[in-house]
């Protein structure tokens, strides 16, 4: 009997030891991009109900957080400050209250944001105020403060979930000077995305050694030279030519995309773009298998999800009802 008891204890210890060494971590990554002021499911320009909006996006996020909890990572890829009159009102009319967009994104618990060209277009007074009100970092590795030569915004964010280290590198299309007057972005410059990605990938690998590397790029898919010198829409170029990215989240061009590409090192990279106005979102499942604390395998799958299929978040609408009513009065 003693022998059987010893064997049982030994087997139990063995099973527990194996269980402690092996682990599966599941992450849900949700990307919004080019929301363009569509905070409510109502178009204040046409005075009609709207199929997109942060209110619909949050209905999806609420549902998914029931399962994933802190393992849901919510990211925005820029161009959120301009498009609907509600955004204009808090950009230029009510400049004393906390910016509505920042309040909404804080309420939704975004983990990181990114700058878009239309966010820059609002002017430094507006976008700096919005950034300073956000409870999460707004990224911009290639937005450089001319006086210091350093990024004006955090270049990347480091997160850890269930022992998995995640790094998100944010960049914007460098073609801002081709569209926007310098008085809107005075004191800044916008560096080439591929050059910036190479620089920061080296730093990130040496300093952070991430298990999952995400690019959050406000740039589209088909690269071309704008005004003869700016590499516009370089997201795919970076995904293919700069090894190290597992996922590249795209925006800016309002074109839906979800596919895998192979980079120059022979590794697969998921590239995904949810187009605009909060009508669809990037919905990514990542499964990582760890052994002895190290990632042994990664499975990454992405789809574009229609937000209309999840209804409207009642909690969101209730929380921001006063601002909605105010918008109806003043717009």
Name each model-derived stretch.
Residues 1-23:
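Bacterial Sec-dependent N-terminal signal peptides
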Residues 21-308:
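Acidic, metal/ion-coordinating pockets
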Residues 3-7, 109, 323:
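Intrinsically disordered, low-complexity N-terminal regions enriched in serine/proline/glycine
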Residues 90, 323-326:
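Generic hydrophobic, helix-prone segments enriched in Leu/Val/Ile
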Residues 14, 319-324:
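Phosphate-proximal small/polar/acidic motifs at interfaces that engage nucleotide phosphates
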Residues 307-315:
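Acidic, Ser/Thr/Pro-rich beta/coil linker or hinge segments at domain junctions
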């Amino acid at each position: 009997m003693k022998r059987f008891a010893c064997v049982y204890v030994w087997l139990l210890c063995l099973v527990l030891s194996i269980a402690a060494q092996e682990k599966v971590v599941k992450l849900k990554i949700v990307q919004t991009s080019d929301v363009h002021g569509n905070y409510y499911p109502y178009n204040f320009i046409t005075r009609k109900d709207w199929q997109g909006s942060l209110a619909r996006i949050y209905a999806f996020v609420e549902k998914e957080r029931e399962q994933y909890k802190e393992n849901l990572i919510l990211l925005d890829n820029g161009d959120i400050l301009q498009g609907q009159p509600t955004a204009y009102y808090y950009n230029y009319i009510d400049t004393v209250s906390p910016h509505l967009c920042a309040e909404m994104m804080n309420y939704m618990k975004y983990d990181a944001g990114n700058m878009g060209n239309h966010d820059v277009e609002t002017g430094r007074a507006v976008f700096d105020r919005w950034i300073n009100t956000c409870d999460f970092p707004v990224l911009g590795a290639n937005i450089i403060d001319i006086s210091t030569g350093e990024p004006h915004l955090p270049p990347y964010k480091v997160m850890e979930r269930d022992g998995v280290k995640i790094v998100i590198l944010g960049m914007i299309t460098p073609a801002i000077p081709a569209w926007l007057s310098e008085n809107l972005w005075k004191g800044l410059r916008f560096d080439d995305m591929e050059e910036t990605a190479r620089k920061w990938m080296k730093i990130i690998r040496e300093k952070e050694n991430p298990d999952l590397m995400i690019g959050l790029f406000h740039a589209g898919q088909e690269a071309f030279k704008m005004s003869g010198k700016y590499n516009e829409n370089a997201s795919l170029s970076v995904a293919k030519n700069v090894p190290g990215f597992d996922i590249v989240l795209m925006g800016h061009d309002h074109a839906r995309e979800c596919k895998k590409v192979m980079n120059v090192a022979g590794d697969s990279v998921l590239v995904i773009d949810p187009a605009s106005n909060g009508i669809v979102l990037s919905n990514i499942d990542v499964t990582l298998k760890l052994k002895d604390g190290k990632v042994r395998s990664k499975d990454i799958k992405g789809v574009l999800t229609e937000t209309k299929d999840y209804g409207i978040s009642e909690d969101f609408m209730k929380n921001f009802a006063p601002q909605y009513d105010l918008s109806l009065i003043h717009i």
